[in-house]
């Protein structure tokens, strides 16, 4: 029914009264948004680009390659093109524009990114694409290229990436490359690219406190190598480089005395007289502070209930430090320290709030420890979640082996094995083990992986992706510990039948033969929990022992953590260290790893 003029007026009056009284008038209009609208438009624009429909500009790049596309898409993604098409200059009205210095593949990738938001990067195209993104002022694409280059830094290319980032002024890429150079300094100086650094670039690297070198002499040697590559043009720079980069008090006096006159003359006279300057006046490089420590995972601080902590024991100074605990309080993780001193953890489980629940959910987490910041960096997750897997470094790659999950009918050990490529940050499955494994041991020796558990002794050949059985140990047992020491695989302790044993055996890989050694020097009554590690190039046992005493008819327990060193000639173990105080509780599942750590980056607890 149509409204009369009076009814319309009444409605307007009512709205006015509501507004005056602070009551918003009812509004039947609502706002809605389609979350797929933008994607749909992008898909349609890409379809028209592929079909050559409604295109209004042709872009010509190097070698005469032409691309028909849409002005509005180019202008939307790139301030460079927006300015070109809206400035009123000649290009704004032309049907075709020519771009010099842009490769056809790079232009194709830029257009794919503009129309799809996706880009396929490779080592062959990333720098050319970064250059194009820089010219077209597309920072989001530049950042993707930068992250790709950061993820693939290695001694062979880091100098080139550093120089490339320096040229284009990309600060994050430059800093990451520079950090990598400092961390891998001794490897980088062996590369030809190091000799092509500019003077200012060389100084920016060598004058840093974060240089990972154990001796200042390495810094001096790198300068001499750089100088000798172009002696005539670089001799004039030596005084400045020595003055800004060499910390003479940190060098051995005998080394300083043997410096050739041509280089000694380039150094300030008072700096050559090392004896007159105290080493305390110079800040030591980061690498000079490194100390090999024993890291204990799954420890609990005695003052914090069950809260996990990761103590690190420096036996040289007697100090204890604390490493950042695994993210989300992960337990029973696979642990690995690579030959390059990179610390990884994988899998595990996160404790449940329900103390009754023992069927823990397996996790697929994979983390790399960053020494300088004392934090864990996320990496590509495992293909298969697993608890208690073993991590092994072999042939330049990492392997996650076995473990267990709680699925279906309960607890299930795993046969699966996966391989991690550090350059591509990805996992791939490899051949299954012949038998499922949990609570096993895994070690690497001469590019092969050895798995031990009870009567099963397996060998894996990564290049052939092949498993084979080897001669089992003479006293088969489970839940023992294995380590490689002086061309033999040692397997110690474990459970045989229902009894814990302290048996030690050594396997000669070349002879395919097991040899029985003397038992461990631990008292069974002390209920010892034992971990086997190679520490300071020697085979060691880390032992948690429990002692029971009676005081006034009250039983009291105390625990001691001790370190025993093996003498292979005498076939004996000697206690070489005892922790000054029990700062933490080591449960049944504690694990030990050995790595070089930087005390200044850790939290000191004793």
UniProtKB/Swiss-Prot annotation:
Q: Which UniProt keywords apply?
A: Cytoplasm, Cytoskeleton, Golgi apparatus, Kelch repeat, Repeat, Translation regulation, Ubl conjugation pathway
Identify the PROSITE patterns for this entry.
BTB
Q: Which InterPro entries match?
A: BACK, BTB-kelch_protein, BTB/POZ_dom, BTB/POZ_KBTBD8, Kelch-typ_b-propeller, Kelch_1, SKP1/BTB/POZ_sf
BACK domain mapped to chain residues: 158-258
Main localisation: cytoplasm
Q: Which residue intervals correspond to the Kelch repeats?
A: 342-396, 397-447, 449-487, 488-534, 546-593
Q: What does this protein do?
A: Substrate-specific adapter of a BCR (BTB-CUL3-RBX1) E3 ubiquitin ligase complex that acts as a regulator of neural crest specification. The BCR(KBTBD8) complex acts by mediating monoubiquitination of target proteins.
Subunit field text: Component of the BCR(KBTBD8) E3 ubiquitin ligase complex.
The identity of this protein, by name, is: Kelch repeat and BTB domain-containing protein 8
Species this chain originates from: Xenopus tropicalis (Western clawed frog)
Source gene? kbtbd8
């Amino acid at each position: 029914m149509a409204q009369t003029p009076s009814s319309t007026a009444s409605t307007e009056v009512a709205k006015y009264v509501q507004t005056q009284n602070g009551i918003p008038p009812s509004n039947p209009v609502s706002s809605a948004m389609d979350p797929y609208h933008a994607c749909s438009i992008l898909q349609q624009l890409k379809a028209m680009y592929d079909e050559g429909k409604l295109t209004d500009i042709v872009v010509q790049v190097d070698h005469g390659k032409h691309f028909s596309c849409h002005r509005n898409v180019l202008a939307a993604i790139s301030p460079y093109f927006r300015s070109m098409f809206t400035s009123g200059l000649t290009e704004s009205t032309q049907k075709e524009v020519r771009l010099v210095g842009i490769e056809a593949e790079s232009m194709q990738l830029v257009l794919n990114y503009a129309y799809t938001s996706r880009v396929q990067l490779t080592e062959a195209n990333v720098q050319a694409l970064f250059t194009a993104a820089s010219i077209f002022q597309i920072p989001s694409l530049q950042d993707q290229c930068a992250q790709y280059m950061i993820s693939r830094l290695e001694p062979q290319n880091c100098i080139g990436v550093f120089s490339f980032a320096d040229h284009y002024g990309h600060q994050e890429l430059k800093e990451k490359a520079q950090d990598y150079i400092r961390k891998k300094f001794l490897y980088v100086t062996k590369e030809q690219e190091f000799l092509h650094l500019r003077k200012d670039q060389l100084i920016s690297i060598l004058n840093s406190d974060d240089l990972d070198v154990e001796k200042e002499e390495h810094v001096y040697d790198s300068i001499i190598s750089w100088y000798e590559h172009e002696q005539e043009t670089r001799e004039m720079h030596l005084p400045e480089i020595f003055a800004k980069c060499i910390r003479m008090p940190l060098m051995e006096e005998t080394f300083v005395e043997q410096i050739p006159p041509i280089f000694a003359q380039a150094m300030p006279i008072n700096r050559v007289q090392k004896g007159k300057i105290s080493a305390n006046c110079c800040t030591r490089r980061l690498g000079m502070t490194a100390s090999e420590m024993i890291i204990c995972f799954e420890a609990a601080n005695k003052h914090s209930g069950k809260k996990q902590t990761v103590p690190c024991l420096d036996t040289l100074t007697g100090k204890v430090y604390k490493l950042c605990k695994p993210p989300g309080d992960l337990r029973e993780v696979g642990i690995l320290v690579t030959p390059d001193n990179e610390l990884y953890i994988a899998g595990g489980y996160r404790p449940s709030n329900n103390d009754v629940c023992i069927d823990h959910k397996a996790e697929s987490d994979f983390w790399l420890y960053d020494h300088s910041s004392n934090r864990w960096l996320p990496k590509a997750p495992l293909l298969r979640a697993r608890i208690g897997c073993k991590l092994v470094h072999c042939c330049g790659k990492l392997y996650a082996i076995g473990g267990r999950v709680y699925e279906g009918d309960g607890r299930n050990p795993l046969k699966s094995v996966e391989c991690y490529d550090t350059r591509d940050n990805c996992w791939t499955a490899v051949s299954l083990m012949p038998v499922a494994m949990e609570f096993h041991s895994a070690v690497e020796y001469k590019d092969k992986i050895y798995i031990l558990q009870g009567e099963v002794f397996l060998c894996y050949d990564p290049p052939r992706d092949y498993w084979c059985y080897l001669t089992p140990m003479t006293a088969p047992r489970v839940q023992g510990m294995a380590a490689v020491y002086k061309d033999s695989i040692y397997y110690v302790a474990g459970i045989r039948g229902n009894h814990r044993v302290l048996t030690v055996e050594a396997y000669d890989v070349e002879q395919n033969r097991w040899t029985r050694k003397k038992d461990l020097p631990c008292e069974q009554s002390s209920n010892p929990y034992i971990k086997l590690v190679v520490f300071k190039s020697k085979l060691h046992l880390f032992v948690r022992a429990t002692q029971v005493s009676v005081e006034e008819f009250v039983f009291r327990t105390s625990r001691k953590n001790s370190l025993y060193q093996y003498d292979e000639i005498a076939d004996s173990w000697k206690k070489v260290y005892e922790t000054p105080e029990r700062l933490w509780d080591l449960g049944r599942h504690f694990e030990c790893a050995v790595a070089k750590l930087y005390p200044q980056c850790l939290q000191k607890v004793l």
